[in-house]
């Protein structure tokens, strides 16, 4: 059996591809592999950006593997580090993750996409949370989706399970950009290369600030930032990269980021 998760690196970018028959559904073993992959990415100082995509032209990911569940995988089983799909609960993921959705993205697959920082979609991609139709709750999406798109659109998706095509998902802000299917991965790499050329310490600080602010009142969050109470912000202030950014601007040249 081939590996369900394939990876390749180029420069500072890691590409992660879900490749499971028949629709890239995720079982416990695959989730644990994804967790290990993203944890290694998080902890590798040479890697700055990740792209998550899937091998099929029809399916990105439908979420939980129902066949595996019927064969004995427990819904509350060991998903591995990072929870389902390796990203949703991975602590301190302070590097940008791009999701390149190349087909049907629903249920837990959409929850994984929502755990990424930027979502690009092929023009034929579709999105849904169909759990309601099987009498279950899209647990992580119930928390995340109303924070990502207008509340009433999120509630319609959660309450009815209706599908959005790529253009509508883009219109509501769920998707950053829609591309022809043949261009999706080249556009994802273009975005990844752009981010990989940027300042990693600033990215880390931005991601921690955003995470912290989601559960804090604005003033409390602002005080935590300005008081340098967040580890990544404290590391950023006074770093070589921060000074390099100032110097490069003053000298009208491109900065050289070192992550120090």
Describe the role of every protein-language-model region.
Residues 1-57:
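Conserved CoA-thioester-binding segment of acyl-CoA-metabolizing enzymes
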Residues 1-11, 44-45, 57, 161, ...:
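C-terminal alpha-helix plus adjacent terminal tail
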Residues 16, 33-34, 52, 65, ...:
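Terminal peptide-recognition signature
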Residues 25, 59-62, 68-69, 107:
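Short active-site-adjacent helix-start/loop capping segments
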Residues 31-43, 66-105, 137, 142, ...:
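An acidic, glycine-rich surface segment that forms the CoA-thioester-binding/catalytic face
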Residues 57-61, 106, 128, 210:
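Short, active-site-adjacent cap segments at secondary-structure transitions
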Residues 91-203, 239, 244-247, 252-253:
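Crotonase-fold acyl-CoA enzyme core
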